[in-house]
């Protein structure tokens, strides 16, 4: 049974926390169950924190709960220390940390709701997929 290694865009994490319906939430459950490996860098963890703290009211969580969630993700994740040698590839600079992490950590997948933003990363052999497509892949592999 393959254990896929994936980078999760912030929009997937947010969607999974916003609603218990849908593939994003199911992916978070399968992550906790050890069915796939989240790849994480300091930059991506910081992005997660910024978005979750900014959206805490919408998500219905306190800053303390946000901190606990991020701590849990860090424990579950495979941490990557990235080089400073990265040439921007993407039209949106906010997406670069995810592309950098996926490329340098040799991720199997980059999971996002914005596939078209990551088109250049596909040329590096990274499969850029929706949460639903990744969920189907993880379920088929377990």
Which role fits each region the language model picked out?
Residues 22, 39, 61-64, 89, ...:
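Residues at secondary-structure transition points
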Residues 27, 98-99:
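Short, hydrophobic alpha-helical packing/hinge segments within bilobed ligand-binding/sensory domains
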Residues 89, 96, 103-109, 115-142:
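Acidic, PIN/NYN-like endoribonuclease modules and their adjacent C-terminal/linker elements
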Residues 10, 42-43, 113-115:
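Short secondary-structure boundary segments
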Residues 30-85:
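PIN-domain endoribonuclease scaffold, especially VapC-family toxins
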Residues 17-18, 52, 122, 139:
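Short, flexible helix/strand-to-coil boundary loops that buttress conserved ligand/catalytic motifs
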Residues 15-16, 85-91:
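Short, flexible loop segments at the rims of nucleotide/cofactor-binding pockets, characterized by
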């Amino acid at each position: 049974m393959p254990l896929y290694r994936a980078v999760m865009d912030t929009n997937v994490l947010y969607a999974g926390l916003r609603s218990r319906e849908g593939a994003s939430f199911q992916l978070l459950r399968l992550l906790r169950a050890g069915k796939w490996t989240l790849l994480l860098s300091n930059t991506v963890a910081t992005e997660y924190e910024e978005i979750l703290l900014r959206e805490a009211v919408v998500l219905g969580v306190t800053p303390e709960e946000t901190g606990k969630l991020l701590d849990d993700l860090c424990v579950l994740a495979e941490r990557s220390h990235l080089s400073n040698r990265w040439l921007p590839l993407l039209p949106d600079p906010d997406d670069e940390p995810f592309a950098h992490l996926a490329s340098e950590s040799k991720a199997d997948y980059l999971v996002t709701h914005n596939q078209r933003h990551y088109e250049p990363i596909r040329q590096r052999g990274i499969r850029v997929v929706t949460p639903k497509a990744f969920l189907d892949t993880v379920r088929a592999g377990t």
